[in-house]
Amino acid sequence: MKISKIYLDMDGVLCNFERRYFERYNELPGSMRDRKDFNIHWDDFILSNQFETLDWWPGGKELLTYVCFLHNEHGIEVEMLTSSGGQKHHESVARQKQVWLDSKGIRFKVNVVAGRKTKAEYARSDTILIDDTPDVIQSFNAAGGIGILHKEVGNTLLKLKSLVTEDIYNLI
């Protein structure tokens, strides 16, 4: 099977939303996600343009370098597949994430979906999604795609290299 496209999530894969959120509100976003006061912080986070200036996620540059190599040397398409966290601030978050990518010189196409559950709609048997959220990966896999749960760059690179190497050897 030929891998035709790799989708990269942004938050928790390339950029460090979690750290910035914790620095500002002294809580991790995951602990707040299901509580009503998350929306208070969420509004502030968006209105202060925080997505534009997030730090790199540990290993994010290394992962991006390898994915760029796959794009340039093997013709594998690369796109961002990231969530805006809902309709309320969708346009603002999409713009801020584009600013972040532009500031890092990342020119791949950006797909910003309103909710993470929508990511499964991008699944195909020849596409890979690298994402840090278990239910997103489960849904992507169930929809026929190849999901890599990203927790640490070394493991993600091993899985990605294994899939791509298998793909290259199948062409020989």
Regions found by a protein language model. Name each.
Residues 1-48, 142, 152:
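Active-site neighborhood of HAD-like aspartate-dependent phosphohydrolases
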Residues 36-42, 148-168:
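A short, conserved beta-to-alpha structural element at the edge of catalytic cores
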Residues 128-160:
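Acidic, Mg2+-coordinating phosphoryl-transfer loop and its flanking beta/alpha structural elements
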Residues 75-76, 106, 145:
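Short phosphate-binding/catalytic loops that engage adenosine nucleotides
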Residues 65-68, 98, 102, 138-141, ...:
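Class I S-adenosyl-L-methionine
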Residues 54-55, 60-94, 101:
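Substrate-recognition element of Asp-dependent hydrolases with the DxDx(T/V) motif
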Residues 81-127, 135-137:
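Substrate-recognition "cap/lid" segment bordering the active-site pocket of phosphatases
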